[in-house]
Structure formats: structure tokens, C-alpha cells
Amino acid sequence: QAETATEEHRAELEERIRRGEVGSVLMSVGATAGNTPQGEIGVDYYNHLQRIAVEESPQGIPLLFGRDVIHGHRTVYPIPLAMAAAFDPAAVRDCYREIAGEAANDSVHWSFAPMLDLSRDPRWGRIIEGGGEDPYVGAQMARAVVEGFRGDGTDRAGSVLACAKHFVGYGAAEGGRDYTHAEISDYALYNFYFPAFRAAIRAGAKTVMSAFNDINGEPVSASETCLTGHLRGHLGFDGMVVSDYGAVHQLIRNGVAEDDRAAAALALNAGIDMDMVDFCYLDEGEAAVREGRISMETVDRAVRRVLRVKAAKGLFAHPYCERRPVDYAAHRMSARRMAEKSAVLLKNSGRLLPLRKDAKILLIGRGAEARAELHGSWALDGDASATPDFCLAMQEKLSGGGFLRYDRDCESTLTGADAVVFALCEDPYSTGENACISDITISDYERSILRRAKALGKPLVGVFFYGRPIAMQGIAEWFDAILYAWHGGCEVAHAAADILFGDVNPSGRTPVTFPRLATHLPLY
């Protein structure tokens, strides 16, 4: 699999495709695409690449285009962890069906989702991409996402191939640090880590991504035990396995391969059928076959698996993207409903909520004017400028003499306010891949605002636009009411305002444990 080329390397990519050296294109640049700016998807460009593959390459085999469509495409829905808080698999499935339609309309055949890593450590940045700490809930989310992506059929227009990732144990990395070692017993593998993958496979997932990490000292991407014994033998998977970004080359750093040729042999023999981006298979595979490190039977097996996936997607019959009308307005309403279902009312002392619409509200905190922060990580194609902020959403709710004053840093002495609403937000770049943190609480800046707000002596409501659960000791007791709205997507501001003023009943429940202190971790 090749990466989408930057402008100066486009001719090189096209020539590789023309020579038949590329079977798939990653529609982004860099391993941490969720936290780095990405170029606009161009249907004409990807149809151009497809035309080269189909009409000019020796084999005439169509390309498979893959992109990280994690929790939305043009329309950004709540992060997967927030969707899990809704405990409504049918609603999740419906959202992903809409997501698939938008992505397919932009040439995407294959999404690198769902992430099925069981995670019990909120310091890990990628906790936001999964279904939480419970294997049963994770399995329900897995099935819902795969079924949503598939729609009426994998080969139908508007569908996207799902990729269950990361097999296996990536979320168990020590200390919540990305890419690090994991110690997992067979008991834990079978009872905690396999159920979500089993559910995804039974729901029809045709691709699986291997994990970066090692388990008990063995890198997963070189593990025949994991990728053939567990995945294909125990779980019955018969589709295609793709490596994570650069994971084959990384086997050198893992200390099990001396060079790319050895890494290619280890990975292909273990069961990885497609090498993502690092070209170890392309550059060294032929030599490894000549040297007897890889058999032609193994090569043919991997090729058949890749071709079966392309055939299942219908690429041989319909290789080009034909754009269709998409009801983006309806999708935004779906995103709003999911954000409403996902929000969790953690506290409501004295039945402070709902607020009156004729109330005098002092709104504080930078979360009130945030836009991109509401999307969270892995929102590659959402337009944050079109996302309403929380200040606007709150203002729209007031009537009958009610008014809202926004003072970001709480420097006001508005003693006539009926309530103070503090909007807190987490930087999305502190979540996602390679974005782990040790301090899972609010910042010193936010604590200073909290002290000023409390000094006003008014009822205090906290609205948290966060990705991960945070340590609540020294925070929760300062608030009279707390609404955890998560990184809830492009309509979460309206959803949170709906809940605060009683137009929507808060129904979300926590899919992960909120620790009092980070020292309690892991806690589940």
C-alpha cells in the first residue's frame, strides 16, 4: 500500500501504479493523520489514479483506496467512546451507514475503523477511538460499526469496507504509552480482548489491521501465533490482514529483524497480507523468495486474500467513483441526536438542571468558543468553521427576558446571574495516536477560572467537551452540576444546550470508569 503523494512526488506514485507495484493507496499522509493537517480528498485525482491502474498497468487490477474515517467524514459525529456512552448499537449502526455514504462519495473504499482495542487507561490517547473498558460493550460497538459501514452490501454504492483494528492488545500498552510493551495472559486474551474482534468478524469485517505492539515479548506483526493461530484459527477470520503504518519495517526496531528483507519474511509468513506504506514487501519480497525465506505458496495466498477483498467490494465491476447526492443536513441532525444520546449527566445537586430559559446566565471558559476542539481527533474532513460554538447554542435557547454574558476568563462581577456555566474543552491533539498524557485532570489555567467562578457564590454548571475521562477529585465537588458532553462532533454544542435547558433528557452512561485520581489507574 502506497501513501497519497505530496505534490512533488505525484509523478513517482503514478509511475509505481503504472508499473503495477501498488495495489492500494492510503488517502492521507503520515502515521498520525488524525492529529496532522491533511489535504482535501479529490475524486477526480483518485479516479485518475484508478484509471492508470486499470488501463495502463500490466495486471489491470483496480486500486483499493483507504482512509481513516473514524467517527465521521464531512459530517463529524461524536468520537467512538462517546457513541459507546449512548448504549444504543442501532443508533451507532445508523450513524456509520451515513458516514459510509459520505466517504464512498469521495472515493473511499475502505475505512481503518472500528478500533476494537479494549482500553482501561485514559492516559492512552487512543482510548477515544474505542468502545471503552467492557468487552461486551466493545463487541456491540464492533458489530454496529461493521454493519453500518457495510449497509446493504459490501459491493453496493455507499458502502465502505471496515477494518477491525488493532489485532491484538494495542490498548493494553504499559502506562498508557503508545506503541509500548503489553503483558497479556491467555485468559485475558480470550475473555477480554478477542470478543470485539469475534463480533466484527461475524458481522462481516473483511479486513483486520495488525497491532504495533508486542505481547509478552513477541511483536504482533511477526507473530504467527496471533495472526494465524488466534485470528484465523480460533476466531475464524478468512479475510485480508494489513499491517499498521510502517509496522513491518518497525520489526527492525523491535529487535527481531536485522533488515527490511528479514522483516518482510517475518511479517508475510506470520500472516500479514498487505504491507502499509513502508514498501518492505515490494523492495525485498522477491529477494526473500529467491533465498527461500518466503514460499511462493505464501505469496499466492496473500495475493488471493487481497484480490478477494477487492472483488467483494465490487471494484472489478465498478472501479471508479461516481458521485451521488448526499443529504448532509439530515446527517447533521443524526450527529446531533447521537451527541444528545452520548452526553452523560455526572452530577445534578439540588436539581439545578434544567436551567430556565428566562435565566440570566454567565458563560465562562474557552470551551464556549471552541469549534475544532468539539470535533476531537481523527476528524480529517470535517469543516470546523461550519460547527456552531457553545456560546451561540446557549444564546439561541434563551427567551422571555433571559440573557447570556460570555466572559472567557471569568473576570466578571456579574452578581445578578442566576447561574454560571463553565465550558471546558480538551485539545484534540492531546488525544489520538501518539498523544498520551500523564496528567488526566484539568489545567492550572482552568483551575484558576474555576476558583473565580466559585467565588461568585452562584450555582455552577460544568460542561466538559473532553475526549478521555478525567480524574475528578478536586474538581467534581466544586460544581453543582456536571454534563460530560465529550468531543461530541459538529452538533455537540446544540446537543449540550438542549440538555442544559431541558429540551432533551440526558441518557448517556459512562462506558469507562472515571478515576478520582490518576494514581488509581488502571481502574475498571
Question: Which residues does each PLM region occupy?
Answer:
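Glycoside hydrolase catalytic-domain context in secreted enzymes
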Residues: Q1-Y524
